[in-house]
Amino acid sequence: MGLLSLYNETSGKVSWELYRFSIIYITISNHTNIERRSDLKIVVGVKQVPDSAARLVAVDGKANWGDSPLIINPWDEYAVEAALQQAEANNGSVTAISIGGESSKEALKHALAMGCSDAILISDEALAHMDSQVTSRVLAGGIKKLGDVDLAFLGRQAIDTDTGLTAAQTAHLLGWPALTLVVVISNIDTAARTIKVERSAEEGRFTVSARLPAVLSIVKDFGEPRYPSFMGIRKASRAEIPVWSLADLALGELKPTVSWPEIMNPPQREITTEMITGATPQEIAETLADKIMAEKIL
């Protein structure tokens, strides 16, 4: 089009065509810079669970934790720590999200006290019974509503259900890479939109790279989470935490695909203890070996 104008039109027409092209080029460049911003927008999922010292018992086929206090899921503290480290290194922000009732705000306040910028509670009566798939759909909906999220961090698993599926399922619903069991975050290139991590495995560690955005689950070998600071605790205590419903996330009826119709206590086992004595260590060892062979343990 420009060459045709140069051949047939006046020089004023040609100059206008070149000038218009320059404007288009600058607009595209600016748009690209917006898409590849240098800061990171991070989400971390946290859950309110019974204290790790609590004992689960079955009462009338239902799980009962007694009067155990509620705490932030210990695995999620490692996820919060990982998220905060990346935010600090990349001029980013961290928003904590929890799904549950009013008491779940305590887990969010713990995350705020550790250093998270914001917190959001997703609560709805329809979420009284959830499995990992429902949890993942709600979490993915919250991430989509926030918009422009680069990284989502989750703990390895929750200590009350121990499924360890939420990170992978959330990544699948978002269409993002799932980087699970992360021990080290080696590099994040905000310009190239890539991340490199080390994953824990029985065979050792694997180095994996992926495109952003991505979902990560963090294991405790990542490093000890920081303690909430005094100023952080004060700030968190005054924080107004917004509450989103399923309607806010444009999610319809969510039905769990897995149900727990009944929970049973394991049968009681009778355990007896016998002290083996002898005049010498060799005699004791021989007696122990005879008993092990007699019981066919080996």
Question: What is each model feature region?
Answer:
Residues 7, 19-21, 25:
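Aromatic (phenylalanine/tyrosine) cluster motif
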Residues 25-26, 32-298:
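N-terminal glycine-rich FAD/FM-binding segment characteristic of electron-transfer flavoproteins
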